[in-house]
């Protein structure tokens, strides 16, 4: 039996974590096994790599170093958490995955998309998400929400120009493959966002039940 791999993507402050929990509740209420996880992270080792990636330090991290750390964490995450869950038929809801790598390290840092694609193939093989929800909102709104949460991490400290590139990359990827991506207006009040998610539930349940 093969599970269902759903990723939640979007810039800072888009509400991915909150809505991931909401989707999980709705799916579990229908009797579906759901695994909640996140990137970078998802395993003890990958969470340690996450800390390195997100914690601001005096030494400037080279962009290639950042990219390789992201994929190192992903390799561990896939091997020990995501693939086993999918193999037993679970629905995996992952807060960020490789689309974020294309957006942040590709568009934001200006790294080669071909290099990212090569690492994607090496680490993931043929595994790609079955569905990706892109939570979109204006950059200034997202950064204001992130700031309201408290201390900013290393990525959240980037400026508006960086996050505009990130947003545009997410939108471009969603437009290029509408069969896999669903765009969600995350600038709406939370109740309206969750109404949008409710409208997706019938097809998610059908796919999860095979």
Swiss-Prot record:
<dbReference type="Pfam" id="PF02223">
    <property type="entry name" value="Thymidylate_kin"/>
</dbReference>
<dbReference type="GO" id="GO:0006235">
    <property type="term" value="P:dTTP biosynthetic process"/>
</dbReference>
<dbReference type="InterPro" id="IPR027417">
    <property type="entry name" value="P-loop_NTPase"/>
</dbReference>
<dbReference type="GO" id="GO:0004798">
    <property type="term" value="F:dTMP kinase activity"/>
</dbReference>
<keyword id="KW-0418">Kinase</keyword>
<comment type="function">
    <text>Phosphorylation of dTMP to form dTDP in both de novo and salvage pathways of dTTP synthesis.</text>
</comment>
<dbReference type="InterPro" id="IPR039430">
    <property type="entry name" value="Thymidylate_kin-like_dom"/>
</dbReference>
<protein>
    <recommendedName>
        <fullName>Thymidylate kinase</fullName>
        <ecNumber>2.7.4.9</ecNumber>
    </recommendedName>
</protein>
<keyword id="KW-0545">Nucleotide biosynthesis</keyword>
<keyword id="KW-0547">Nucleotide-binding</keyword>
<feature type="binding site">
    <location>
        <begin position="10"/>
        <end position="17"/>
    </location>
    <ligand>
        <name>ATP</name>
    </ligand>
</feature>
<keyword id="KW-0067">ATP-binding</keyword>
<keyword id="KW-0808">Transferase</keyword>
<dbReference type="GO" id="GO:0005524">
    <property type="term" value="F:ATP binding"/>
</dbReference>
<dbReference type="InterPro" id="IPR018095">
    <property type="entry name" value="Thymidylate_kin_CS"/>
</dbReference>
<dbReference type="GO" id="GO:0006233">
    <property type="term" value="P:dTDP biosynthetic process"/>
</dbReference>
<comment type="similarity">
    <text>Belongs to the thymidylate kinase family.</text>
</comment>
<dbReference type="GO" id="GO:0005829">
    <property type="term" value="C:cytosol"/>
</dbReference>
<dbReference type="GO" id="GO:0006227">
    <property type="term" value="P:dUDP biosynthetic process"/>
</dbReference>
<dbReference type="InterPro" id="IPR018094">
    <property type="entry name" value="Thymidylate_kinase"/>
</dbReference>
